[in-house]
Amino acid sequence: MVKKILAGILCAATMITLSVGCSGGATPGASTDPSAKITGNTGEVKLEKGDKYAVMTIKDYGDITIKLYPDAAPKGTQNFIDLANSGFYNGKTFHRVVADFMAQGGKDFTGKTNVESFGIETNYNMRHFYGAFCYANALGNNSTEFYIVNNKKSQDYSSFSTSRIDNNIQGYEDYAKQYDKNSQEYTYYMFQANYYRNLKQFIENMDDATKAKYKEVGGTPSLDGNYTVFGQTVDGFDVLDKISAVEVETNDAMGGKEVSKPKTEIIIEKVVIKDYE
């Protein structure tokens, strides 16, 4: 089990981070305190009076209902609400689907989107459980793209050791030292070192309840600490599962190195933001 977890971590370190572009010039990095006390998705998740939630309608598939967490990710949540209310997501697609990992959408392939990017927002009580709603990012910057965790396989972190992660941190820092601090290579390797440092921090702060939930419902804990989790699916899991089971082919958006592009377009008809009463 530990070997499988490590393999997942090594893969995840590049799978989402390098998959998207972004506009603007925000400084990479977290913009919130991960230890801030909030009610996140680590406990029971249900809609309560006053909650903000999104209903995403996918053509020929149905609706996915997502509880939003503005307390955990104020910038990210408001950005998504503004985009949804403006109709930005209408007609966009799920352009990338990886079974037992995530389904990603919201990319503007025209390159005409003028959305200011912003840093990630993380919290120990917001985790990548099955159905988590998150921002894809490029070197620490969020913009318009999101993903929904579709991995239902049990994740057992009860005896996980972070020693291998320490080795990865040191390795990337050693690589970075070979380059000028103003170079792209230095920036890339230090980003990777910080990626693993953030991941280690989140694993070390994974309490027993969080470990138990990962074991029960599944998810991708190897992404914790490096992506903004700002929502949690509460209804429409069957729709998510259908999307996750589609036939895929080589994805040019991933440099042609990944088989993840749905053979038939998965179109988002609309995203409606509501207040639960």
Which role fits each region the language model picked out?
Residues 1-8:
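Positively charged n-region of N-terminal signal peptides that target proteins for export
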Residues 2, 22-277:
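Cyclophilin-like peptidyl-prolyl cis-trans isomerases
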Residues 12-13:
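Repetitive helical segments and hydrophobic/amphipathic motifs
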Residues 17-21:
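C-terminal motif of bacterial Sec signal peptides marking the signal peptidase cleavage site
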